Amino acid sequence: MVYSVGLTGNIASGKSTVAEFFSELGINVIYADKIAKELTSKNTPCYQDIISHFGSSVVLNNGELDRKRIRDIIFSNSNERLWLESLLHPVIREKIEEQLIACTSPYCLIEIPLLFNKHHYPYLQKVLLVIAPLESQLDRIVKRDHCTKKQALAILATQPNLEQRLEAADDVLINESGLSELKAKVNKLHQKYLREAKIKQ
């Protein structure tokens, strides 16, 4: 199987931008969140399980899941979050493996927001952690989710702590300056992963 790097980091740390930069360099990127969205689309087995568990209050008028409502529930109740993770994570891991087999680039990047235990993903060779200053994260969440700073802090409070993240990480990318500096850091890591994957340019 292709050499693979797990990309992770807390919400609003800049993971998606980092993933885009790797993609621009010709690297296949697999998005765990995108897979999760497909797995929970209308009338899928996971969709039915979620409705059976949470009830009709999590369904919009068009029959789709009310993802904001579900997010509010799991951010305020750790048991509900664990239930949802135990439903989705095994299936997500399976789908990631299927996409890895089809990967055509020298190595593959897998964006997994909640990755803090590499053992759950035996096909990962490396874990790349993106971290950003707290204020930057809060600003991004407030702008993206149109929420208050207090709500943004509550969202961040549900994320794995930095110590856990660092323990699982092989490489750490600090996103604290502009995009050009971030791009330069990605370029450096790209060269490193090419070497590690034993691929000559």
Swiss-Prot record:
It is an enzyme of class 2 (transferase). InterPro entries: Depp_CoAkinase, P-loop_NTPase. The keyword Cytoplasm applies. Its EC number is 2.7.1.24. One of its GO terms (biological process) is coenzyme A biosynthetic process. Pathway: Cofactor biosynthesis; coenzyme A biosynthesis; CoA from (R)-pantothenate: step 5/5. It is found in: Cytoplasm. Keywords: ATP-binding, Coenzyme A biosynthesis, Cytoplasm, Kinase, Nucleotide-binding, Transferase. GO terms for molecular function: ATP binding; dephospho-CoA kinase activity. GO terms for cellular component: cytoplasm. It comes from the Bacteria. ATP binds at A12, S13, G14, K15, S16, T17. Residues 4-201 form the DPCK domain. Pfam families: CoaE. It catalyses: 3'-dephospho-CoA + ATP = ADP + CoA + H(+). Belongs to the CoaE family. Catalyzes the phosphorylation of the 3'-hydroxyl group of dephosphocoenzyme A to form coenzyme A. This is Dephospho-CoA kinase. The gene is coaE.
